Amino acid sequence: MGVAYEVGQVSGFAGPATVFRLDPTLAGHEFVTVWVQDVFGAQGPEAVVVAAVDASGAAKSMTRLPGSYVAAAPTVSGALWLNGYQISR
């Protein structure tokens, strides 16, 4: 199982966001930003994973990476787990 090292919290996303450094990388990305956003219109709550430029957490693109999912109670750890990572603080 891979490891997602928590780098820190960032703002500017649709919910409280956390930056992680991944080992091994996910789709070639060492850093990702992950957050959970509330219901938006007809879509339920969503855990979102996007590629980050670096440890700053700035998104390279808002295109969702694998692990993003919609569920009744999504979690950041669930999104990382879907990709085979466990969180290390």
Which residue ranges define each predicted feature?
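A detector of low-complexity, intrinsically disordered, Ser/Thr/Gly/Pro/Ala-rich segments
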Residues: Y5, P16, F31, A73-P74, ...
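Mixed-charge, Lys/Arg-enriched low-complexity segments
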Residues: A51-R89
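Negatively charged, low-complexity tracts enriched in Asp/Glu with abundant Ser/Thr
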Residues: M1-A27
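A short, structured beta-strand/loop element
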Residues: G28-K60
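Low-complexity, intrinsically disordered/propeptide-like segments
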Residues: T25, H29, V34, S68, ...
